[in-house]
Amino acid sequence: MPKKAGATSKGKNQTKEPETPPPPTGPVATDSKGFVTIAIHAKPGSKQNAVTDLNTEAVGVAIAAPPSEGEANAELCRYLSKVLDLRKSDVVLDKGGKSREKVVKLLASTTPEEVLEKLRTEAEKK
């Protein structure tokens, strides 16, 4: 049976919720609680601390500490706090304590754009 002109359908399409924008792609994002998080690819055992590369998946960070007994994790948080001009207590390892792929959470009030800009500046220094 053909539809009448001007008739509205009572399907699921009528009650469409407003679309939420997709989460930002990139290494720096905001979690559900509003904290800024950074995806890190750690490279422990380097000669000096440095941001080596910034790509869409993670920030490559060379760490001048051995990957034993959490030394590299502590040095990573220390180095990132210096680069981002934050207190050491505001930079916390969230995930990846025994992995090279880590997530660092920033407890200070900052935006992902500011963090990305500071990381880019540090990466260009090498």
Curated annotation (Swiss-Prot):
One protein family per Pfam: DUF167
Record PTM Phosphoserine, positions in chain: S89
GO cellular component, one term: cytoplasm
Keywords: Phosphoprotein
Family matches, as SUPFAM superfamilies: YggU-like
Positions of the UniProt region annotated as Disordered: 1-33
Manganese among keywords: no
Keyword Phosphoprotein: yes
Domain of life: Eukaryota
SMART domains for the chain: DUF167 (SM01152)
InterPro entries in alphabetical order: DUF167, YggU-like_sf
PANTHER family per the UniProt record, alphabetical: UPF0235 PROTEIN C15ORF40 (PTHR13420:SF7)
HAMAP family named in the record: UPF0235
Family to which the UniProt record says this protein belongs: Belongs to the UPF0235 family.
NCBIfam families tied to this protein: DUF167 family protein
Protein name from the UniProt record: UPF0235 protein C15orf40 homolog
Native organism: Rattus norvegicus (Rat)
